[in-house]
A protein has these predicted regions:
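Short internal beta-strands
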Residues: 1-6
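Extended hydrophobic blocks
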Residues: 8-23, 37, 41-42, 46-50, ...
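Conserved donor sugar-nucleotide recognition element shared by glycan-biosynthetic enzymes
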Residues: 14, 27-31, 56-59
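Short, surface-exposed alpha-helical segments at coil->helix boundaries
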Residues: 28-35, 90
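Short phosphate-binding loop-to-helix
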Residues: 49-62
């Protein structure tokens, strides 16, 4: 399990504490929280934890370091990440692994957001899901990050991730939503 403390960690701590009051989350890394969750709910533990990363890019590079340090060869990696950040995580991994490594994306949920009167809400309840405002905030931050331009994380910008094709309909929807929600 990979995850230190980043921009979503405090919210994750609150959600875990609310859903599982017996799991103490104060000052825990994301990996430590998921380890405690696995132990509490399923009675099992991960073999390895990476707890120092502070962002999606570190998650990838520190994961690869962990695999190398423990002499763990791989031909494929399953990425199971918060769906709002799944595509960026895969693009980060793609930047650092060889072309013959298979990246399997397994988003941990699939959320549909609908209009509920004057507000947004989830079409279905998803256990442990972000509050809708936080989810929209996360989503609105992803398109600028995924962009391969001078401001984005792609090779033409900060070069944190591999190139990602963003469909035109997604770009148009983002521009429309930005007028209401801002870009982050």
């Amino acid at each position: 399990i990979v995850g230190g403390a980043g921009h979503t960690t405090d919210t994750l701590r609150q959600v875990v504490q609310l859903e599982y009051p017996s799991i103490e989350t104060t000052d825990l890394s994301e990996a430590d929280m998921f380890q405690k969750y696995l132990k509490h709910v399923y009675g099992c533990e991960a073999d390895y934890l990476e707890t120092k990363s502070t962002n999606c890019g570190n998650n990838i590079t520190y994961l690869l370091d962990l695999l190398e340090e423990n002499n763990i060869p791989f031909k494929s990696i399953i990425l199971s990440q918060d769906a709002s950040m799944q595509r960026r995580m895969a693009a980060g991994l793609k930047k650092y692994v060889k072309d013959d490594v298979t990246i399997i994306n397994y988003a941990t949920y699939c959320a549909s957001v609908i209009s509920c009167g004057e507000e947004l809400c989830y079409a279905e309840n998803i256990h442990g899901m972000w509050p809708i405002e936080r989810y929209v905030n996360l989503l609105m931050g992803e398109i600028p990050r995924l962009s391969d331009d001078e401001n984005g994380y792609g090779p033409s910008g900060k070069n944190y991730i591999a190139h990602v094709d963003i469909p035109n309909n997604v770009k148009l929807a983002f521009e429309e939503l930005k007028t209401v929600f801002g870009s982050e």
